[in-house]
Each structure stands twice: as structure tokens, then as C-alpha cells.
Amino acid sequence: MMKTNVAEILKSGTTLQEVIIKGWVRTFRSNRFIALNDGSTINNIQCVIDFENTPEDTLKRITTGAAIAIKGTLAESQGKGQSVEIQVSKIEILGDSNPDEYPIQPKKHSFEFLRENAHLRVRTNTFSAVMRVRSKLSFAVHKYFQDNGFNYVNTPIVTGSDAEGAGEMFRVTSFEDNKAPVTEDGKIDYSKDFFGKETNLTVSGQLEAEAYAMALGKVYTFGPTFRAENSNTTRHLAEFWMIEPEVAFMDLDGNMDLAEDFIKSVLTYVLDHCKEDLAFLDARLTQEEKTKPQLQRSDMSLLEKLKFVAENNFKRVSYTEAIDILRNSKPNKKKKFQYPINEWGADLQSEHERFLVEKHFKCPVILFDYPADIKAFYMRLNEDGKTVRAMDVLFPGIGEMVGGAQREERYDVLVAKMKAMNIDEKELWWYLDLRKFGTAVHSGFGLGFERLVQFTTGMGNIRDVIPFPRTPQNADF
């Protein structure tokens, strides 16, 4: 007798074989037909019980959400939609589910309702599909870097530096409320705190990854990061995962090559290994698009978007060229953009990025050589003195997906930039050391994993692609 899962049974199509399977009841019809799901696939398997010979007490306990164990024989299914079913010889109730209290009923629930029940929402088709895709994407990330000679580095979550220079950080302290010691000028004295200095949750592992790239050559981080940005939008989370490779002796051109190859590789992997889940999510998104006003509908289905990125060469365009294109575009001239493009130096918005990808070039785009004034201190200054070796990868439907740069490897230039941006050299003494001892050209990029999952699954809200979202005023579960 074989202990197996639903995915294996449906894939094999074998009949006349005895199996034992455990899972959760999705539906129970006519006191006879159980739709059972064990999480291995989006599909349920029909289990047909012998109503006359099943105790009434057992029948009453077969409710939506109940955990059960089934023993039976695989048979050719008489119903539509699946090749096999299980003719049940024995059923055991492993865990009851009170139908009057169980929130996830066999009907359509709003995403807002499901966020309030995040501990149970993965039992729905949509969220189980999203989380299986997330799992495969995560594996594909590690597989790509490991197959290409990268070392995985675990960078610290508690840090004393702000890699982005934005200041939107969660403070870490051991001081009790209203009992923090203060200095003579009334400020909190962090020298007496646990770490002896002011510390925060990390916003990026990039700086530490640079240190390891300057010894191991090719490294990547893949871990949680935190932003105390008070943004209640469909694109922001306070806790999310970042993918950040860093490579020694690689310039911006190599960095753009790496980003394009990486993205194509992980999307191709998911297209090959998540066909059923992506087909379901594609159909879901198609129905959702029909409810939108015509002008807001996407021209591409989910699968078309994924193949659009995975199969097209990325167009490389300088920021300056992009500004000229946008400034002379019809939407800009007719004032259709929410943020008009009037001059060089403007920080591009999602609407501009999407126009370049979806309307102008009709392929993924990599913008490079941005104005220094709108980018971080660690990006390498170009010879013109006003642009930096930064790059952003732009996707359809979402805009920026990847942000990266060739790092400033020249000690004197980096110090000057830090002073100009009022960044304390003492806080980053170790980062400056990397430019004093064996400095070299090096580059890397950052990619928010949840944003990649959101693009891959077609979910409209980033809170729906992470198991337990952390957002302003929300840290349940």
C-alpha cells in the first residue's frame, strides 16, 4: 500500500492501486463525495465513500476544513475534470472543523477578508497557488547563484548603518519605556544600550555583501529587510525579502548582463515547474481584468507578461535618452502623465517606466547613468561629474523591478560624496576601509523578492504574496 500525495496520484493516473492519503476537506457533497486537498497541488482529488456503511457520527464530522486520513483504491473517475478518484474503504477524522466557526467556506472571499485571516488563507486555491510559486521562485534564486559560482552570505539583521541613507529604519534597543539614559543635552545615550551604540533593523545587506565580494569574488544575500516607511499602498511592506548579489571586478555592463540573465533564468524555471498554478493564476487575473475600466486593463495576460520578460532581449537606454523620449511623448505633451516630465533630473515614476516598456520599446528596459542627485552615495560617479553608474530594470505592469549600480571604488571620491550628503564617515569606517585595502571595480543590484512574486503571480497587492504581511498598524499573527 502506497502513502502518497494528491499531486502524484493525479499525475500518474494509475488505477486499481491501494493508497493512503491525508489532507483537508474542501467540500463534502451528498454525503458521498469528498473533495480532498493536501497542499501538493491546486487540484483536489475526489474521494467516494460508502454512505450506507459509514457511521453517521463520522459523516457529521466530514466538514469543510476537517483533517482526514483516507484509505482506498484508485479508480477511473466517472466525474468531469479528473482522471482518477479514490473509492474509500476506510476514513479517519484526524482533526475536526466546526462549520459554524470555520471562516474559509467554499465560496469566494474578498482579499481583505482573507488578510484578516492570514493564518488560514493559504487553504484557498489562490493563496496556495501563490505560495507554491513563491517557494519555487525562492529555490530558483538559490539555484541560479549556486550554479554560477556565487557564495551565499548571511548579512546582519541588526545594524548600525543605513545603507540607503533614507533614515526610515526600525530602532533596536534594550531600553525599557521611559527609562532610557540621556546625555547632558537631553538626547538618549545609546552608549549605555545593549550594543553600545544606536542600532536598527537592516534596510539592505548590500554594504556587508560588498565586503565579502572583495574577498570571495561573487556573493549574494537573500534575507529579510525592514523599512519604517509609513506607506499604506499595494506596493509597500515594512518587512520583506531582498536578493542582493555583489561581484568583484565587474563593471556596470557586466551588472546589467547579470541582472538580465538572472531574471530570465528564474522566470523560465517557474514557467517550467509551476504550470498548473500559473494557469490558475492566469485565469484568475483574466477574470479580474474584465472588472476594470477599459483604459486600466492590461494588454497582456499573466503568462504573456512572464514570457515577455523571459524571452525578449532587454533594451538598454541611458536616463538622458529616456528623458528625451518621455518629454516628447504624446502622454506628456497631452498632459496625461500624473507627473509631467519637464526637465532633465526628474525622478521617474512608475507611469513613465511603464510607458517606456509597454508603449515605446515594447520589451523589458534597463535604464542606466542616472543623475547623481537622485541616487545613493555609494554609486560610482561618471566622468561628467553629474551622473552615476546606476541602473534600473523595468518590467511591464509594474515599472522598476531591479535597482543596481557599479559601486564607487575610489576612496577620495567616496569620502567627498559622503560629506556632500552629510553621511558620517565614522559610522562607515569599515566600508571606507574596503577602498583603502585592495580596492577594485565591483557592482551589484537589489531585487525585492515580494515584488518579483507579485509580478510572477499577477496579484494586485503585495500583501498577498507574503505569508504574514507587516504593514503600518498591522503586525498580527
Q: Can you say where each PLM-predicted feature lies in the sequence?
A:
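Class II aminoacyl-tRNA synthetase-like tRNA-binding/catalytic domains
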Residues: 3-248
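Generic, well-ordered alpha-helical scaffold segments in large soluble proteins
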Residues: 24, 140-148, 204-207, 211, ...
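Short, charged, low-complexity patches
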Residues: 134, 252-260
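Metal-assisted phosphate- and nucleotidyl-transfer catalytic regions
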Residues: 163-169, 174-189, 261-393, 420-440
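TRNA-recognition modules of translation machinery and tRNA-sensing kinases, especially anticodon-binding
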Residues: 196, 200, 214-224, 237-251, ...
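Inter-helical turn/loop segments and adjacent helix faces that build the functional surface
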Residues: 249-253, 272-274
